[in-house]
Amino acid sequence: MTLQEYLTSLRHKTVAVIGIGVSNTPLLRRLLTEGIAVTACDRSSREKLGPLADELEAAGATLHLGEGYLDGLTQDVIFRTPGLRPDVPQLLAAQRQGSTLTSEMEVFFQVCPCHMIAVTGSDGKTTTTTIIAELLKAAGRTVHVGGNIGQPLLCQADDMEPEDWAVLELSSFQLMTMDRSPHIAVVTNLAPNHLDVHKDMAEYVAAKENIFRYQRPGDIAVFNQDNDITRQQAGRAVGTVRLFSRRSEPEEGVFLRGEDILCRHNGQERRIMTTADIRLPGVHNVENYMAAIAAVEGLVPDGIIRDFARTFNGVEHRIELVRTYHGVRYYNDSIASSPSRTIAGLRSFPEQVILIAGGYDKHIPFDVLGPEIVEHVKLLVLCGATAGKIRAAVEQAPGYRPDHPEILEVTPFQRAVEAARDRAQPGDVVTLSPACAAFDQFKNFMERGKTFKAIVNGWRE
């Protein structure tokens, strides 16, 4: 089915689109252009939506805004925004009455005419997705990047050619209701995350598993052999399994031998590059490259991989060097919205650092983070709703002694950053690596990271 054929099938149906945000706005415009009866639903007020509300209404949309935006859903087809659970009472009631529940990404999987690689995991998704996309581009392929990053791809599907590649980053929220899988699926790692939304860890893992659950023989699934959960998932994959590992040498996949990154495929082993070729800091980025190499095996020449690794500076908000100020290096690692991500960031630095952490409570335990902070942090500056929980995890960790590390609780966010600056000495590293989501003070981790950068870059020499 093509995108146009799908849209034609909706012309005599009513459609609701929940969420007037970045991912759904192009969809709304396209539906309205096709003359489809559309209701646009959003919790935001008309004032907050601004000119977009006027534009949609002028194009023929019915707006359903505010706290009751989910009430009375009776449309034939309902597009769910990824952040909304599919089992909220209003959606369940609509489905009982005959409504079809779908999403922008689910329909894209139905109509996408080209090859598809999708990446999920708790950490490393964006960097791995970006590496895969850039490697394919460097090899001369036409690439479309979407999902959690890039552009919404559904409305671009008719412009894609069969030989193109769609490279997607998919979250557990997007995957929850998926019933199709990509040609090449990558699971970077899995650890507790988003437990404020998911019922439990089992539901979170099950959602992630949809990325490879519906593959067919001949498809490819890439897993982290060093992660307990993903190693078990590899045994349930239908497609060809490729593993990546820093600690062992899988029969099929990518692994580390000393400082060399090697690939073993169909019984043949070859050296791709060394870890020194990777410009990005941290062992977690070695893992990101190994996952990407496993995904593009046979598609990208080894020399292109090596040349790219030597020059790629990474993605914004991921251990991003913001500035050196009075001899102190400031890093923006705002993407670190889970303990495992912060741990990876801390391990990237050879010295003990000044850490700014804390934020929105996703109900993730911090017990694994405590010992890492004791080992890698000289001063801990806490800010946000989880400050008390992180402090408790550190103070209860083995090896903790009073003031080792010293712990400060400072609000608001700007003052926390300034407190880190005031305590830092030449040669120190200050890193924003919160271990939490940003929603208690910011719209998202990107706004938090940009705010941090603006504060640091605003200081006069």
Language model segments and positions:
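Short internal beta-strands
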Residues: 37-44, 221-225, 356-357, 376-385
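Beta-strand->loop->alpha-helix junctions that form or flank phosphate-binding loops
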Residues: 39-43, 64-67, 102-106, 144, ...
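C-terminal helical cap/extension that packs against the catalytic core
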Residues: 52-54, 59, 368-428
